[in-house]
Amino acid sequence: VLDAAAALFCTVGFTSTSTRAIADAAGVRQASIYHHFAGKDALLLELLLGTVRPSLELADALATGTEPAAARLWTLVHADVGLLCAGPVNLGVLYMLPEVAGEQFAEFHALRSRLRARYSELATAADDGADDRGALVLGLVESVIVRRRDTPDLDVAAVQDAVADGVLRLVGCTPAEIALARAVPVALAV
């Protein structure tokens, strides 16, 4: 059901997708959807949470790591870009739906804010700087959503490396520090 909803929301749009269409695409009865989800909003919320929870869990674990902050930040960015590029449907485009601004998606926004805060903490620690670059870092990470939309055959591994390196450049790391961050094994790398 979630796969069918994701495909329809990302291609047809949220408003234009009915629970009947989701049920048909999933090969289930419409009543089955309502047995598990209160409606379309609940389906969309679950899809949105699935794009942010794994990254936040990793970010929380990395926050307490002993590896250099640049290595932990590089690892988080690399994993987050991989998550946003995973699967047959570009779920990141759901972030851009106007409906997502609604109050019913407050849990998603709260988790995304926590992720942005973790990015800020790691970015500040990696640079020993005082300014908050979390929003810029998250913006660079989430830029893969548009790249994936425009380039369906994206070389994900190359993009993961490029974005992770780019984030470290953004926070002021030198080429030597970036090379070290790439080389340091991080215990929670995914």
Q: Across the structure, where does each feature detected by a protein language model lie?
A:
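Generic hydrophobic, amphipathic alpha-helix propensity
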Residues: 1-5, 22, 47-55, 119
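C-terminal peripheral helix-coil segments that are non-catalytic and often amphipathic
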Residues: 116-128, 146-190
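Amphipathic alpha-helical interface segments
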Residues: 4, 8, 79, 140-147, ...
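Helix-turn-helix
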Residues: 4, 8-42, 46
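Amphipathic alpha-helical segments used for helix-helix packing
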Residues: 72-75, 83-106, 120, 135-138, ...
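Amphipathic alpha-helical packing segments from all-alpha helical-bundle domains
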Residues: 56, 101-139, 157-161, 165
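Hydrophobic alpha-helical connector segments
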Residues: 46, 57-86
